[in-house]
Amino acid sequence: MNYAKEINALNNSLSDLKGDINVSFEFFPPKNEQMETMLWDSIHRLQTLHPKFVSVTYGANSGERDRTHGIVKRIKQETGLEAAPHLTGIDASPDELRQIAKDYWDSGIRRIVALRGDEPAGYEKKPFYAEDLVKLLRSVADFDISVAAYPEVHPEAKSAQADLINLKRKIDAGANHVITQFFFDVERYLRFRDRCVMLGIDVEIVPGILPVTNFKQLGKMAQVTNVKIPSWLSQMYEGLDDDQGTRNLVAASIAIDMVKVLSREGVKDFHFYTLNRSELTYAICHILGVRP
């Protein structure tokens, strides 16, 4: 293989897209005043890129839910962006979930990310799966509903095939958009996308992209998500524990390489896990041709 020609081909394929790329961004509710400032600075910076939507994660308890609701409403009011709250079936009855969904609809929210949610230790209630939540949302209003997918298999799934069948159930229940867990093995994502097509899943499988600025934090996240960390990725961050600037450059380089290959493979929608930071996501979007 002529690697120089391949690199040129990747760069040329990006330039040929000419703005034919959609991006979306995920944020989470801040825990203190400093993080609150960082969140809104990031939202306003990334707002200029005209994302397809932005999503806000969600905790199981009512306080977290209220914070998510408040952020989503403020995003919509201040920026005009389509804001999608995460919603889970944990720690809320079906009637409560219907009321939450109705409140969102009445507030002008038209998109929801529907998840089962992580069951806390000692949780004994009957599971309310994402498929059930999608059906419930469909019974309330005509939401655009995003659900999660796992190219490297959900940690609780019995098998890769069982996990894929579960995704198909969520689509059949009424979901019309899929966002994947973050990953670093692009080939694994592409094979997963092919298997989705073979099973009759005909919605866009949007890759979740995580620019890694904190490798230690990534290790903790990978343990609970079943995401494989390649050895080459570990080596990239060796010796950088106290060098945030270089870590940022490494993170941007890795993510940019991923989106170049994915775009060459026909991917036109990308979902960025921003961790409430805008700098790297903004730079990666610039490379993709997504600009103010």
UniProtKB/Swiss-Prot annotation:
One of its GO terms (biological process) is tetrahydrofolate interconversion. The keyword Membrane does not apply. The active site is at E26 (proton donor/acceptor). GO terms for molecular function: FAD binding; methylenetetrahydrofolate reductase (NAD(P)H) activity; methylenetetrahydrofolate reductase (NADH) activity. FAD binds at Y58, A60, H86, R116, G117, D118, A130, Y150, H154, A157, D163, N166, R169, K170. Keywords: Amino-acid biosynthesis, FAD, Flavoprotein, Methionine biosynthesis, NAD, Oxidoreductase. InterPro entries: FAD-linked_oxidoreductase-like, Mehydrof_redctse-like, MTHF_reductase_bac. Its cofactor is FAD. Belongs to the methylenetetrahydrofolate reductase family. This is 5,10-methylenetetrahydrofolate reductase. It comes from Neisseria meningitidis serogroup B (strain ATCC BAA-335 / MC58).
